[in-house]
């Protein structure tokens, strides 16, 4: 999507703000933030929640569980909460991530937002994040995608 947007091709050119504008810089920032920062914490959370549930010798399980809980409590959870608070703050003053209209950044961030909210994040703690998600899922394009591909399942 980004490559086609940069080349001004197809139906995606309107999803990238004009180069050199503040909205363009925000779009680039949030596109990279999604994969380079937020998803790292979400994937680490998934891994460290999953490890103790995997088959292992009974005497290793308490060690693995304790280690995973400690890593989550001291590293993953504080950083994930800080990232979500940062996003919450941005969405408190912006309808979309990069400008007045939806952009590529919103598509990039949408999965991370869905994943964060599906992983037991207290929705009441992040009302702007929840409102953003609701705006996304109400879009006709989102509804068409769900109709074609099925619902988003965060298993």
Task: Describe the residue ranges of each PLM region.
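GST-like domain detector, emphasizing the conserved glutathione-binding G-site
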Residues: 1-66, 70
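Short, hydrophobic secondary-structure boundary micro-motifs
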Residues: 12-18, 40-42, 96-100, 125, ...
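All-alpha amphipathic helical-bundle segments outside canonical DNA-binding/catalytic cores
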Residues: 17-25, 75, 93-105
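GST superfamily/GST-like fold recognition
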Residues: 42, 97-122, 130, 136
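Active-site rim elements
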Residues: 70-77, 96, 119-122
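Amphipathic alpha-helical packing segments from all-alpha helical-bundle domains
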Residues: 73-90
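Long hydrophobic alpha-helical segments typical of transmembrane helices together
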Residues: 122-155
């Amino acid at each position: 999507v980004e490559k086609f947007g940069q080349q001004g091709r197809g139906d995606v050119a309107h999803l990238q703000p004009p180069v050199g504008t503040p909205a363009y810089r925000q779009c680039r920032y949030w596109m990279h933030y999604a994969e380079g920062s937020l998803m790292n914490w979400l994937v680490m959370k998934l891994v460290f929640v999953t490890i103790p549930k995997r088959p292992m010798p009974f005497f290793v399980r308490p060690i693995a569980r304790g280690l995973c809980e400690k890593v989550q409590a001291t590293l993953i959870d504080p950083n994930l909460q800080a990232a979500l608070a940062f996003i919450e703050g941005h969405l408190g003053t912006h309808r979309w991530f990069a400008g007045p209209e939806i952009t590529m950044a919103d598509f990039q961030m949408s999965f991370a937002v869905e994943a964060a909210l599906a992983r037991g994040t207290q929705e009441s703690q992040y009302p702007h994040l929840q409102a953003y998600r609701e705006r996304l899922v109400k879009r006709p394009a989102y509804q068409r995608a769900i109709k074609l591909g099925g619902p988003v399942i965060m298993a």
